[in-house]
Amino acid sequence: MKKSLALLALASLFIGTTSCRKKDEPKPAPVVSTDPNTTDASADVAAIKNSQAVLTVPAGSVVYIEPQTGLKILGATMDATDKTKYTVGTNGLLGINGNVEKLKIQSDDITNLSLPKSSPLLKALILVSKSSSATATATAIDLSGLTDLESLLIAGYSIESLDLTKLNKLKNLGIGAWNLGANFPEMTDAFGTIPEKASRISEVKLPANNVIENFIMRTATLQDGKCDFDNLPKLKKFFCQSPFFSNFTFAKSTELEVLYATAPTAGIKLNADLGNKPKLKDITFRTASLSKFAVSNATELVLKDSNADAIAVEFDNIPAKQAYGYITGRANKTVTSITLKNIAFSEANLVNLINKLETRNGTLKVKGELLTTAVNAALAAKGWTGAAL
């Protein structure tokens, strides 16, 4: 009898342990679906609002959604011929559910977009207007659930404040869009070819510990202090069209390789006080004016495509040919302060550089031994003075 009771107790323990183990086992990971998209136009409001993505739009408006597989669309009907085109029902709500790696949403009419739920398979989100100008209605966006997102492009919308603070894995960020072609293959790989679209995004809040590597920006309303460009420690490439902000300093971006900016809004002078940028290979400022242009330790730097002038130039440990070419070919008509450190200039180089200056009452700062009689004479002829470093 005792033996039977002992066996029964042992069996109960085994069964209980097995049951606990099954209960504690993780749920199967979601997989990308390849089934064609389906719709439920009659879904109730509660079901739509419980979706992974919820859009608020005027009733009867059209939203374009890609991909054509892996999604269930609630509150809308699919077009009979264009399988990316959905017409929203009378309640003005559209829900998106499913497991896809890239989601693209196009509409001029979204007033609210919410993605508060975890979507671990979603790596890229593209939200763009159909029109090329920023005529889309002012939009509120909640992306707090996309903690695994790696690529985000938002363009063609008016957004007062865009909160990306939860997106700690984001590597590719596009605020506004224009066709970069072969200049930025990382963005083309992430988003495909997106036509030029104006945007009015006035503030961008980045994750404190962000890992953003590639950043494009084209927005007409973002001013200084509305995006922390000085906290981009992993940044490699930055492209900007028509900036409405002036500070291009990128204080923590010591990994920066390429910097491109063109046509500042309202003729704003840019402050390109870049500091130590040892990996920077290409700086291009076009159709722009710089209040200050300073960079150091960029030993492979190329400046040949920059046509921006500058008032103050400070170069430290960059190629002498690039420094000479920029100052004599672009900055010579506006510059009034030049500082040259750790650059292999000869006396003849300096005299030739000074002779090409077209401004007066400026200051040249170089090593004391370079302020030779010939250099000082050339400076005096231009109304400039020399100062020893």
Where are the regions a protein language model picked out?
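Generic short N-terminal amphipathic or hydrophobic helices
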Residues: 14-17, 200, 211, 267
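Solenoidal tandem-repeat scaffolds enriched in leucines and small polar residues
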Residues: 174-191, 208-218, 225-232, 237-244
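Bacterial Sec-dependent N-terminal signal peptides
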Residues: 1-29
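Short beta-strand elements of solenoid repeat domains
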Residues: 105, 126-128, 153-155, 163, ...
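Detector for repetitive beta-architecture
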Residues: 93, 102, 112, 124, ...
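Canonical position 11/12 of the leucine-rich repeat
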Residues: 108-111, 131-140, 158-160, 179-187, ...
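N-terminal capping/linker segments that flank leucine-rich repeat
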Residues: 20-131, 142-147, 166-168, 177-181, ...
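Low-complexity intrinsically disordered segments
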Residues: 14-15, 185, 296
